[in-house]
């Protein structure tokens, strides 16, 4: 499973190649991953990617339309998913390549052999709705002090390991 550090590495790898660029095409080859995929081929083209950030193990893609409206993709790589960058022409898609997002001469491909990942198109900020609102603070959050951590531990009878893995205490879902 891609853990938080791998998701951050993915974000850092994707962002320089695609932030500031407009979506020119989308190809979805699988109608359903963990959840049904919306018609991304109709929803994304023409939108410009403004920002790509990570929250826990989610990638938040912030787009803006020509009219100035914001739209988002909330993606999770599940157990075995990955995002890859290709210069066009890209290699032919294989069995587990489920979605391509084209930004001019750059293609970003989502691959997931186990199909446990998700790609959700949203018209509201995903940081203000589930599942992100139930997550705890990030590991590098300056508000996560030793005193705060100790106070949170006093509220539970779980082991420290369970607290670290429990997503409402630490952002690692």
Q: What are these regions, as identified by a protein language model?
A:
Residues 169-173:
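A short, hydrophobic C-terminal helix/tail in secreted or cell-surface proteins
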Residues 1-108:
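A cross-family signal for N-terminal binding/gating loops and helix N-caps
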Residues 68-168:
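Phosphate/anion-contacting hairpin/loop surfaces
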């Amino acid at each position: 499973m891609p853990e938080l550090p791998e998701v951050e590495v993915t974000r850092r790898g994707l962002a320089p190649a695609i932030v500031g660029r407009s979506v020119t095409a989308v190809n979805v080859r699988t109608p359903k991953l963990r959840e049904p995929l919306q018609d991304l081929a109709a929803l994304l083209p023409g939108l410009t990617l403004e920002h790509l950030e990570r929250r826990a193990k989610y990638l938040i893609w912030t787009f803006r339309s020509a009219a100035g409206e914001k739209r988002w993709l909330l993606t999770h790589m599940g157990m075995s998913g990955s995002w890859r960058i290709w210069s066009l022409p890209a290699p032919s898609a294989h069995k587990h390549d489920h979605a391509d997002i084209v930004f001019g001469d750059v293609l970003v491909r989502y691959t997931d052999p186990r199909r446990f990942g998700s790609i959700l198109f949203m018209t509201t900020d995903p940081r203000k709705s589930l599942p992100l609102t139930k997550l705890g603070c990030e590991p590098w959050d300056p508000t996560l002090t030793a005193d705060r951590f100790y106070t949170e531990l006093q509220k539970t009878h779980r082991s420290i390991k369970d607290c670290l893995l429990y997503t409402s205490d630490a952002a690692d879902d």
